[in-house]
């Protein structure tokens, strides 16, 4: 069982096939990728295991910062998390996180890219909160 910080945060990179996941501690401003998931029961297990104080969801926006179909689906996902887990859910602009994740992980599996994108979303959240 992982050690729990009082303020552990889970972040999600929402996708239609997979959801990238990362865990982090704001006090240390560290984030680490976890295996990607694809179902709410898997998310429930992560929430029970890590007992986060809050959740973060990346919102995919266009280059211009406009919402589109995936933005609305990610927002729906964030609202489902709020309702189901009764935790605060922050939204973070995730433009370019998947591109940066692919750059960091050239040649690795797509599942790893999704969770590294979630790690980048969480790192951005920490930067914005500082």
Language model features: what each stretch is:
Residues 2-12, 16-130:
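Phosphate- and other anionic-substrate recognition elements at nucleic-acid/protein interfaces
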């Amino acid at each position: 069982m992982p050690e729990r910080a009082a303020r552990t945060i889970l972040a999600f990179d929402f996708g239609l096939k997979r959801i990238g996941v990362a865990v982090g501690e704001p006090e240390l401003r560290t984030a680490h990728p976890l295996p990607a998931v694809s179902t709410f029961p898997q998310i429930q297990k992560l929430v029970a295991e890590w007992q986060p104080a809050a959740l973060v969801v990346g919102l995919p926006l266009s280059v211009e910062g406009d919402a589109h179909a995936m933005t609305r689906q990610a927002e729906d996902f964030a609202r489902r998390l709020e309702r189901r887990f009764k935790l605060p859910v922050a939204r973070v602009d995730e433009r370019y996180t998947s591109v940066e994740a692919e750059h960091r992980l050239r040649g690795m599996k797509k599942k790893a890219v999704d969770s590294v994108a979630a790690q980048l979303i969480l790192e951005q959240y920490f930067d914005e909160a500082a």
